[in-house]
A protein has these predicted regions:
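Short, amphipathic alpha-helical "recognition" segments used to contact nucleic acids or chromatin
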Residues: 1-5
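Anion-binding and metal-coordination hotspots
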Residues: 7-20, 30-388
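Short amphipathic alpha-helical interface patches used for protein-protein assembly/oligomerization
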Residues: 24-28
Length: 388
């Protein structure tokens, strides 16, 4: 949570900040005569606590929000983002032979008659060759086997995880924050994430039942819509991606057609349009707070369970921020720091005014008697006389 509010992503950075800040020492109950925990201690404590404990912390914060009427839970939105893993692409090896990527490229060069290439020649050959594909079925990272080869939004390829938020569209509270493999399609994880959100609402004793679920067109899949329509109480509001041809339902179950058409009608309605506007605003805001200013865009841990633990606490810290904004009108990452800076600036301004006043009226060398305004003095005297 300190990492979220201070905008620090690494364990070493968090440990250093706890050691350096007097206010954080006071908050954590660490006297100046004692050393604060180092990054190794933080890692050991996190590893010893199971992920269920971290989920209990998350639901405990949800319970606090519910006490302040900050959890509605009826209308939610779902979206995902990629978290860059703590592993480089050069750490990948083939699953079948165990060869690293450089040796694999050298074998391709040998087939074309190029022997004993230098590292620069290998890099140039790999950059120029056509149909270059690296799949998770054939390659795995030795540094973090659970990280997936993922194409990022900027077109680059990295080892990554996928973080998915389920957000209350009425209060901006995160109801679930789940970590999945980076190569999982959005439609694969939609129902699981919403079910996690409902479980969290139940464990937080909110009494809320999720009814409406909004997502972007990346979540649209016929099979997923059909499954959710058949065995869940959720109504989906998911726009359809543009297709080159009209959908054909010949030979397909009637349930699929009914589910797709019902979702289409809801999306085109006024409520559907409003939910899409709210989704693009509220869900993206949670990612901006947690991943960008909160320091969670790149994970410094390895293994899905460790990443899940850290991300649950970051999402819980975001929800504490929602509560703080309700109570104190501040609660974003670095928000308290800005408040302190503003307070210090105001105090400094008051101090400068005090010094100026002191020099003007107390210091004899700078004392300058002001001329008497007789008309103003006479008017003041007349007003006192009239009052008497």
């Amino acid at each position: 949570m300190i990492g979220y509010f201070e905008g620090i992503g690494s364990q070493r950075g968090i440990a250093w900040r706890c050691s350096d800040s007097l206010s954080l020492r006071e908050f954590l109950g660490i006297p100046l005569t004692e050393d604060s925990p180092d990054h190794s201690t933080l890692s050991v404590v996190r590893d010893r606590l199971p992920v269920e404990i971290h989920r209990e912390v998350f639901t405990w914060v949800l319970r606090l929000l519910n006490e302040k009427k900050l959890v509605k839970g009826k209308t939610v939105a779902v979206d995902s983002t990629a978290l860059e893993a703590n592993a480089a692409m050069k750490s990948i090896v083939r699953r079948d032979t165990g060869d690293d990527y450089e040796n694999y490229v050298k074998q391709l060069m040998a087939k074309e008659g190029i022997k004993d290439p230098s590292s620069e020649e290998v890099r140039r050959f790999d950059k120029q060759r056509q149909d270059k594909k690296v799949s998770n079925e054939e390659w795995v990272s030795e540094s973090d086997p659970e990280a997936s080869i993922t194409k990022m939004k900027d077109g680059t390829t990295h080892l990554a995880y996928k973080a998915e938020h389920v957000v209350d569209l009425e209060t901006n509270a995160i109801l679930a924050a789940e970590i999945y493999a980076g190569d999982h399609a959005d439609s694969q994880t939609l129902e699981d994430s919403v079910n996690h959100a409902q479980t969290n609402l139940n464990e937080a004793e909110t009494g809320a039942e999720i009814q409406d679920v909004a997502a972007d067109k990346g979540y649209h899949a016929t099979e997923q819509l059909t499954a959710m329509a058949e065995h869940t109480p959720y109504r989906t509001y998911i726009p359809e991606p543009e297709l080159k041809h009209n959908r054909r339902w010949t030979g397909k179950p009637a349930e699929q057609k009914d589910a797709v058409y019902a979702n289409r009608r809801r999306v085109k309605g006024e409520r559907g349009k409003q939910m899409q506007r709210q989704r693009s605003e509220y869900v993206e805001r949670t990612f901006a707070h947690v991943c960008e200013t909160g320091g969670a865009r790149r994970t410094w841990l390895r293994g899905m369970e460790k990443v899940q633990k850290r991300y649950l606490l970051a999402a819980a810290a975001h929800n504490i921020g929602v509560l703080m904004r309700k109570l104190f009108q501040m609660g974003t990452p670095r928000g308290l720091q800005k408040y302190v800076d503003d307070l210090w600036g105001s105090a400094r301004a008051v101090y400068l005014v005090f010094l100026a006043t002191w020099h003007q009226f107390v210091t004899p060398t700078t004392f300058r008697p002001q001329p008497i305004n007789r008309q103003k003095s006479l008017a003041t005297a007349n007003s006192f006389t009239a009052a008497a």
